[in-house]
Structures are given as structure tokens and as C-alpha cells.
Amino acid sequence: MRCKFLGSFFLLFSLSSKGADCRDSGTVWGALGHGINLNIPNFQMTDDIDEVRWERGSTLVAEFKRKMKPFLKSGAFEILANGDLKIKNLTRDDSGTYNVTVYSTNGTRILNKALDLRILEMVSKPMIYWECSNATLTCEVLEGTDVELKLYQGKEHLRSLRQKTMSYQWTNLRAPFKCKAVNRVSQESEMEVVNCPEKGLPLYLIVGVSAGGLLLVFFGALFIFCICKRKKRNRRRKGEELEIKASRMSTVERGPKPHSTQASAPASQNPVASQAPPPPGHHLQTPGHRPLPPSHRNREHQPKKRPPPSGTQVHQQKGPPLPRPRVQPKPPCGSGDVSLPPPN
């Protein structure tokens, strides 16, 4: 009997001492948008436990009492059989200090614990990008609270930084790079193999060459356009010149026709001129003219004299030649009568 009493005394003393130790506050981390269980440290539910109370500040959020229905402030809370408090779908408003108190069946408080709940946003998958011109690699994460970035090359840890962006200038590319983003509620990682040429062209040189090529194409197109326009203008000018020449030639061809018609008119009016020439041996004699004597014919066949020198002015007679007067031969000496040639 005495041993049983001593055992009960030591059990109560140990429970009360544990409750005193649990008064020290602890920190619990929760992920935004996810659920969490607030565990009672160093506690195990037994038949001697009569009541478990969870309070946030001075507000009761959940209560377990033996032989009674559990009390829950809202559907976001749930008290489990082991006394833990479950919070569903955490929001930033759920952060704060939660106090848990445990009572025994005889009404003695055997445990009192304060838990500080902090809500963190989970990290997103990091991104790796690099620039070959300056041999720089950058690791970046877009989402997450209290993020720490860790960079590895192969199995070698290169550096760590507590921020969302980290840059590193490499010296070799013998192994792939791995970027790891972590916080107290999540972690994500990404690995990339960096490929760069041995000697990369500077960015300004690439931009300059591209701009020069565009200018060359522009001026080439402008030159071709000007040449085509000039050829078209020359072709139009040549066409106009050909039209002018053709109109002039047609005008010249039409000009002599009236003269030819005028010349043909007298010919048609003079039937004698239009007749066929007489046969050889037949001499056409004009009426009223007689053949000249032989002496006069010989005169006509004599060579003509040279024209007078240039100093003297020669008056040329216009129109047809005038008829010459008849020359009668002198009568022979001794004959008193003048003999006339017989009429034809």
C-alpha cells in the first residue's frame, strides 16, 4: 500500500514537471494553402486525461472533453484523438501563437504549451540561364518566402545565397550546373548543361553586322529600283522620239503628191506630148518652119565658143528659146534673080 502511494506521487510529480517544461514557446512552420497538424510535444493521450483545450490568444478554437462532443470554432479546425490540432488550408491570417492546455480527470493542469505558427509560401521551380559573352550563369526563383538558393556544379557546392536571384561566373564547363531553392516548408531544384562556343563573338559586333546587312539590303533594293525607273523613263522617251520620227516621215511622204498630180494634169491635157515618139527616119516638122539650107546647118554644127570670163555678167534667158530669124543665102554673082528654095 505504501509502495503504491509512493508510485502515484512520483507519477504526478513527473507530469507536473513536464508541463512546466512545456511552457517554453516553440515555432512551427506551415505552408501557405496546405494543411498542418499542431502536435503536443512530449505528450501521450491516456485515460487519465480529461480535457485538451486549444486557444489562439484568448479565443478558444478547439476543445476535447471526455464523454462530450468536441468543440470546433469553424470547419477549418479539427481536434484529433491524440489531442493534436489540425488546421486545413492555411492562410496568412492563421499565423499566430496557439496555446494548448491539458487537464487530468481530477481537474489538475498537467501541461501548458505555446506554439508560434508561421506561414510561408512554398518555393517555385528555379530557372537557370546564362550568357556566353561574359561566362555568367544566373539562377532565379519567382515564388517563395525566405528562399535560400544553392548552386552546385556536379557534386561540388559553389555558393549559397538567401535571396531569389543569384549569379555566378564560371571558369570551366566540365559538369552540369544544379540550382536548388529551399525554405522551411519546401524545396525545388533544376539542372542545366551549359554549352558555349570556344570563342563567342561580342554582342555589339553581332548587332553591328546585322545592322550593316540590313542597310546593304536596303540600299541594294533602292539602287535596283532607281535603275528600273531610269530604264522605264528612257524607254518612254525613245518611244516618243520614234512616234515623232514616224509622224515626220508620214508628213514628208504626203508632201510631193500634190506636185505629181499637178504635173500629170498638163500631160493629160496635151495629147500630142502623150503620143508615142515617131519612128526613126521620120523627122517631125513643126508647121510654119522650113528646113535650113546646108550652109546654115554647117554653122549650127560648128563648135561653140567658150563662155565669157567670170568678170562679165551673162544674162540667162528664162523660158523656152526664141525662134531665130531665117538666113537667106546670098545670090551668086552674075545672076540677077534671086532663087528661093522650093517649098516642101
From Swiss-Prot:
The chain crosses the membrane at residues 203-228. Residues 296-307 have a biased composition (Basic residues). Its main location: membrane. Residues 23-202 are extracellular. The gene is Cd2. Interacts with CD48. Interacts with CD58 (LFA-3). Interacts with CD2AP. Interacts with PSTPIP1. Interacts with FCGR3A; this interaction modulates NK cell activation and cytotoxicity. Residues 23-121 form the Ig-like V-type domain. Residues 229-344 are cytoplasmic. Residues 259-273 have a biased composition (Polar residues). Residues 237-344 are annotated as: Disordered. Residues 99-113 are annotated as: CD58 binding region 2. It is a single-pass type I membrane protein. It comes from Rattus norvegicus. Keywords: Cell adhesion, Cell membrane, Disulfide bond, Glycoprotein, Immunoglobulin domain, Membrane, Repeat, Signal, Transmembrane, Transmembrane helix. Gene3D superfamilies: Immunoglobulins. GO terms for molecular function: identical protein binding; protein kinase binding; receptor tyrosine kinase binding; signaling receptor binding. Disulfide bonds join 132-196, 139-179. One of its GO terms (biological process) is positive regulation of interleukin-8 production. GO terms for cellular component: cell surface; cell-cell junction; cytoplasmic side of plasma membrane; external side of plasma membrane; extracellular region; Golgi apparatus; nucleoplasm; plasma membrane. Coiled coil: none annotated. This is T-cell surface antigen CD2. Residues 320-332 have a biased composition (Pro residues). The lineage of its organism: Eukaryota, Metazoa, Chordata, Craniata, Vertebrata. Residues 122-202 form the Ig-like C2-type domain.
